[in-house]
C-alpha cells in the first residue's frame, strides 16, 4: 500500500468486547497516520470486526462488506473478529474481501497492510490455530461515547454445548490488575465518565497468560482496586456468570463509590433439565439465590438476563418452566436469543429439534415479557431523584441518558449537558419507553 493512502473506516458487530478491540485497532492505525472516517464515507481501508454468536451476525458481515464496496469499490476490506477466526477461508471467498485476520493476527494489522492490493481474487488469510491464542492484549474503547468499554479478560474454559466462543477466542486469560488500572486512568484522563468492564467470562478474572490456570488475583480483587481509581464517576459490570458472582462482590458494589447497581447475569434457560443439556455450571436455585442477594442489599438495582429459546429438547413444558421462572423473578429486562445451530457444537447432534416457527413464537413471548418487566421496574423509579449521564446523540431534538440503575431517560437536546451527570426527577414513562425528567433541587445546588 502506498504511503499517501491514509484513511480508515471501522464497523463493529457483536459484543462490548468487540467494541473495545476495534478501538485498539483504530488507535494503531491512527498512530500510523490513518485518519478515521465514517464507514459510509470513501476510505482506503475498511475494518469490519465480526461476531459469530448468531447466524444473523454471519450474514451481517457480508452486508457490511457490500456497504464498504459501495462507499469505495477500490477500498481494501479487512475482516477480523470471531467469524474471521472460525471461518477464514469462507470469508476470503466473499466478493470484496481482501484480508482476513484471525484472533492472534488482528492486533498486528499494520504488518499485513504493506503491499496489500485490491484484487478480484479471493482474500488473503492470516489465521493461526486457536490454541496459539493464549496471550492477552489489553483494549478499551474511546470515541463518540460517554462510556468506555474496558477489556479485562478474554477467552473461556467453559464448554457450553451451544457456544462457539471458546473456538473463536481461546482459553480464559486476564490482564494484570496493574495494566487494568493504568488503562482506567487513561480513560479517566480523557474525561470519560463511565467504564464498562468487559470480557468473555469476566467472573473468571485472574487466570494468567500462556495456559497458566492459577488465579493470580480474583474478580473481587480487581473491582476492589478499580473502585479506588480517581476521575471515573461510574463503573458498570457487564455480563457475569451466576456461579461466579459471589456475595462479596455484590456487597462491594452495594457500598461502592463508583460501581453502579446494575448486573447482567446470563440464565439461558429456566429449566434445570435444559441447563444440564447446555452444560451450564448452575441450576435455577443458584440463579434465584443470586437475584435475591442483589435485591436484599440493592432493592433498586437493575438486573438483566440473557435467555435462549428453542434449544434442542426444550419442549413446550420446559419452555413454560423458563417463562414462569422469569415471570416470577424480580428482574428488570431480558436479552432474548433464539437458538441457532452452530457448527462444531455438541447441540447440533442433539435430539428434540424445535421447529423454527416455534422458536420465533417463544422469542416473541419472552420479548413481550421483557418489556413488561422493564416497564414495571421503571414505574418503581418514578418520583425519585437520580443521577443521569447524558449521551451525545441528538435524535429529532431529543437527547438520551441513563441512570445508574439503567433507566433510559430523555429531554430536549442541550449540548451543554452532553457527557455530564445531572440529578433529575423521573416524571413519567413516555410512549417510546423512555422516561421524562425535570430538574431537581439537588441539581440546582450542584450548579450554584
Spans of model-derived segments:
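Contiguous mid-protein beta-loop-alpha structural module that forms a pocket-lining wall or clamp
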Residues: 314, 330-331
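Residue-level signal for inorganic ion chemistry
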Residues: 47, 82, 109, 197, ...
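Conserved loop-to-beta-strand segment in the C-terminal subdomain of adenylate-forming
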Residues: 261, 342-348, 435-437
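Conserved SAM/AdoMet-binding glycine-rich loop
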Residues: 77-78, 86-87, 189-316
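Proteins enriched for Cys/Gly/acidic motifs involved in redox and nucleic-acid/cofactor modification
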Residues: 1-205, 218, 248, 263, ...
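Terminal RNA-binding accessory module
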Residues: 349-448
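Short, solvent-exposed loop/turn segments at secondary-structure boundaries
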Residues: 57-59, 171-178, 206-213, 277-280, ...
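A structural micro-motif
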Residues: 34, 75, 98, 232-233, ...
Amino acid at each position: 500500500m502506498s504511503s499517501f493512502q491514509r484513511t480508515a473506516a471501522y464497523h463493529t458487530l457483536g459484543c462490548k468486547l468487540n467494541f473495545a478491540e476495534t478501538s485498539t485497532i483504530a488507535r494503531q492505525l491512527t498512530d500510523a497516520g490513518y485518519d478515521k472516517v465514517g464507514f459510509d464515507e470513501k476510505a482506503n481501508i475498511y475494518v469490519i470486526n465480526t461476531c459469530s454468536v448468531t447466524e444473523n451476525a454471519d450474514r451481517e458481515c457480508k452486508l457490511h462488506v457490500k456497504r464498504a464496496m459501495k462507499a469505495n469499490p477500490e477500498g481494501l476490506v479487512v475482516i477480523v473478529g470471531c467469524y474471521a477466526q472460525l471461518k477464514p477461508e469462507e470469508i476470503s471467498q466473499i466478493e470484496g474481501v481482501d484480508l482476513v485476520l484471525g484472533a492472534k493476527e488482528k492486533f498486528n494489522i499494520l504488518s499485513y497492510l504493506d503491499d496489500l492490493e485490491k484484487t478480484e481474487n479471493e482474500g488473503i488469510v492470516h489465521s493461526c490455530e486457536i490454541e496459539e491464542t493464549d496471550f492477552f492484549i489489553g483494549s478499551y474503547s474511546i470515541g463518540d461515547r460517554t462510556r468506555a468499554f474496558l477489556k479485562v479478560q478474554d477467552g473461556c474454559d467453559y464448554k457450553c454445548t451451544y457456544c462457539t466462543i471458546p473456538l473463536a477466542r481461546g482459553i480464559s486469560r486476564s490482564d494484570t490488575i496493574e495494566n487494568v488500572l493504568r488503562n482506567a486512568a487513561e480513560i479517566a484522563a480523557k474525561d470519560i465518565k463511565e467504564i464498562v468492564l468487559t470480557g468473555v467470562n469476566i467472573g473468571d478474572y485472574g487466570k494468567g497468560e500462556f495456559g497458566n490456570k492459577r488465579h493470580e488475583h480474583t474478580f473481587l480483587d480487581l473491582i476492589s482496586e478499580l473502585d479506588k481509581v480517581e476521575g471515573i464517576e461510574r463503573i458498570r459490570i457487564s455480563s457475569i456468570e451466576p456461579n461466579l458472582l459471589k456475595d462479596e462482590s455484590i456487597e462491594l458494589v452495594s457500598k461502592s463509590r463508583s460501581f453502579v447497581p446494575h448486573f447482567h447475569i446470563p440464565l439461558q434457560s429456566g429449566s434445570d433439565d435444559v441447563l444440564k443439556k447446555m452444560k451450564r455450571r448452575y441450576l435455577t436455585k443458584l440463579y434465584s439465590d443470586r437475584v435475591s442477594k442483589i435485591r436484599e442489599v440493592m432493592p433498586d438495582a437493575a438486573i438483566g438476563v440473557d435467555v435462549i429459546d428453542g434449544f434442542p429438547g426444550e419442549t413446550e413444558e420446559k419452555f413454560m418452566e423458563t417463562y414462569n421462572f422469569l415471570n416470577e423473578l424480580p428482574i428488570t429486562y431480558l436479552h432474548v436469543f433464539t437458538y441457532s445451530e452452530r457448527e462444531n457444537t455438541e447441540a447440533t447432534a442433539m435430539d428434540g429439534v424445535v421447529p423454527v416457527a416455534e422458536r420465533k413464537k417463544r422469542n416473541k413471548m419472552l420479548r413481550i415479557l421483557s418489556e413488561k418487566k422493564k416497564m414495571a421496574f421503571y414505574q418503581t423509579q418514578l418520583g425519585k431523584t437520580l443521577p443521569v449521564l447524558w449521551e451525545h446523540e441528538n435524535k429529532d431534538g431529543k437527547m438520551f441518558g441513563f441512570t445508574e440503575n439503567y433507566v433510559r431517560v430523555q429531554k430536549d437536546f442541550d449540548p451543554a449537558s452532553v457527557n455530564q451527570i445531572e440529578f433529575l426527577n423521573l416524571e413519567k414513562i413516555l410512549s417510546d419507553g423512555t422516561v421524562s425528567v425535570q430538574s431537581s433541587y439537588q441539581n440546582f445546588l450542584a450548579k450554584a
